[in-house]
Amino acid sequence: MQHEFPESDWKTFGELRLVALERFCKRVLDEVPRFPLETERSYHQRYLELFRWLGERNDELAKAFDDPRRSQMLWQLAAIYAYGLLKPDEFARFTPHTRERVQVLAQEAGWRAAQQGDDADEP
């Protein structure tokens, strides 16, 4: 797959990546107090459950945000898109061709696309 896209999309990605990162972190932190930690379990078991859950969120964060490079932009943007971290008007800032490619990649990767903008709270 070619990783060619307009320079304007790369610049937009650089701007919106930071916004999406803040939204992702806020979402995770907002979920922690609601994390189901059954009181029948020991503190250690609950800790391990939370640790495992945070590890899964960290894997998601890495997929979408670690080591941003031009060669990774489309895959990272597909993850950001699938996680519902961009508002529709923000996603619309990318060229139609890039948006289409991102949607196809997200689908091919099996990532369930969240309703764009529903969870995209302001950081």
Model-flagged regions — what are they?
Residues M1-P123:
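Acidic, Ser/Pro/Thr-rich low-complexity regulatory regions
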